[in-house]
Amino acid sequence: MLRAASSLFRFRVAGMVALSCVFGYLLAAGAAGPDMVTSAAGTFLLTCACSVFNQIQEKDLDARMPRTRNRPVASGRLPTTAARAVGMAALLPALILLHAAGGVRLVLLSAAVLALYNGVYTPMKKYTAFSLLAGAVPGALPPVFGWLAAGGNLYSPEIALLFIVYYLWQVPHFWLRAERDRQSYLAAGLPLPSVELPHRYHALLRLWYASYMVALLLLPVFPFIAETAVRIAVCLAGITGLAASGYLLASPVRGFHAVNVSMLFVMLLLVVDRLVTSGIIT
């Protein structure tokens, strides 16, 4: 039962998305608060709901991929009607929690996430690998959820840069994962960037990866970071990532882990810096 629920809701992904919300909250507030838990819980449930609706939309596609064929909807263990009810059961409390944490703005952003992820990205994914350009927008919004729940300004340059970092990170993350799982994607008939653009794929991948690393290097320029040691560490992460790009991107598995570790490392550095600045860590 728990395994089926985990597969349906994709708890691991939802947990990482909720942590991104916590990250945005801590950057804005500098300390934990009740709205941090409320917004993270709402973001977690919203991600679960999107996952359920996605699996309803892609049940035939999931059934053709070894990685996803045993999901409850794709395998037929959970009827579509029941899955839709489960998705709504996750969505409604998500909207209530997010409204409590950040008001109407978070509810509207939640609607944007659903519209872009389930309404645009999921249908487009069958036809073009560049659907990710739309799908990366909702993927970059969780830190914004936390930022707004903490009372941060939606139009501040800091959260705009953070959104850009998350957006740029997702393209190499998902393209490298697709290349890692190449045979499964081809078996399901999903378009791959390396197949759609065989002569330009590697150049585009390097461009997106380099753009992400440059965005990391811009973080110390903005008032995100107070501690000199943290500024240096973030700069070193970006410079190292750029210098080692040829080696890292030569292997989809190696590149996939590199972009993920770099994002996690920088997130942790920024949180530690903010907690030190707030006096919570001395």
From Swiss-Prot:
One of its GO terms (molecular function) is protoheme IX farnesyltransferase activity. This is Protoheme IX farnesyltransferase. It is an enzyme of class 2 (transferase). It comes from the Bacteria. Belongs to the UbiA prenyltransferase family. Protoheme IX farnesyltransferase subfamily. GO terms for biological process: heme O biosynthetic process. Its EC number is 2.5.1.141. One of its GO terms (cellular component) is plasma membrane. It comes from Oleidesulfovibrio alaskensis (strain ATCC BAA-1058 / DSM 17464 / G20) (Desulfovibrio alaskensis). The keyword Membrane applies. Converts heme B (protoheme IX) to heme O by substitution of the vinyl group on carbon 2 of heme B porphyrin ring with a hydroxyethyl farnesyl side group. The keyword DNA-binding does not apply. The chain crosses the membrane at residues 13-33, 36-56, 74-96, 101-120, 129-149, 156-176, 207-227, 232-252, 261-281. Its main location: membrane. It catalyses: heme b + (2E,6E)-farnesyl diphosphate + H2O = Fe(II)-heme o + diphosphate. It is found in: Cell inner membrane. It is a multi-pass membrane protein. Keywords: Cell inner membrane, Cell membrane, Heme biosynthesis, Membrane, Transferase, Transmembrane, Transmembrane helix. InterPro entries: Protohaem_IX_farnesylTrfase, UbiA_prenyltransferase, UbiA_prenylTrfase_CS, UbiA_sf. Pathway: Porphyrin-containing compound metabolism; heme O biosynthesis; heme O from protoheme: step 1/1.
